Amino acid sequence: MLQRFPDPGVDCRVADSRRWWQALTAPELRLVITCDALEVFQFQRAWLPGRRPQMISHQRHTLPGSTQDILPPEALWQTLHDVLAPLAGQRWHVVVVLSNQYARWLALPWQAEVRSQADKAAYYLHGLQQAFTSDGQDWQIRAQPGTYGQHTLLNALPAALLEKLQVALAKHRLPPGIITPAWTLAANQALYTMRQQGFSANGWVVCRESSHLTVACLMQGDWLQIRQLPVDAQWRLTLMQLLSREQVIHPERAALPIFLSQAESGGATSQSMQPFQVVNVQSSHGLGKPSLQVAERRVA
């Protein structure tokens, strides 16, 4: 299960959408897909300045998946059909958030000799193949290049999964504006918090799920690394062990704060995770009741 509160307009920006006009004017339909659930959120757009988007519906449909699967369970597609059928042809801005379980992330170092689009595509594919040789998937790769000399942040999603999603949504005349892994939304929300609270662009951005963490290191606006690691109920201990090792290898990262969604923090505080500083990222819209445990985020 992905654990965080949705933050429309912050974790998914208009600029990220392939359907920017719907993102500006239509209500949002958010589909959060994990191995064990399909969560469906509907948000009414706020038209007046200072008003917040209103959540008008939330449903959770249990799925029989495994945390080891590289694709969602087959039961997802019938469940998705049942959810979308009553909405067919209606005007929505559709946002699909996928568990990090189905994504692969990689921070590739700057290579001055890699210039053409063909060279970049080959470099990205080679990097992913080297890092994830055993997955055996046909991946759709998205790259977020940094500025000169900075790393390129890659994410890859199974092409078969994206194709089935497109077909399912097209069948109900609900074209997607955004399809993204959950960590992307976590990063967007953390970056927004950095700007609002006057933090520099430095920190560990953590996306927590029931069975694993996705952890990325940002220093001076450069995504230096990103990795996924399995966890259980003792996830805070696992995270602290990881960061302690990083302190030894990279002492300059010792003082970086940890950015966690308030829903994900699970009681993690600077006091309970000493010597690390924890920044609880809260929804800018005030969304987030304890009963909601959800997945989302974004990247600059």
Q: Where are the predicted features?
A:
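Hydrophobic/aromatic-enriched cytosolic interaction surfaces used to assemble or bind macromolecules
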Residues: M1-A300
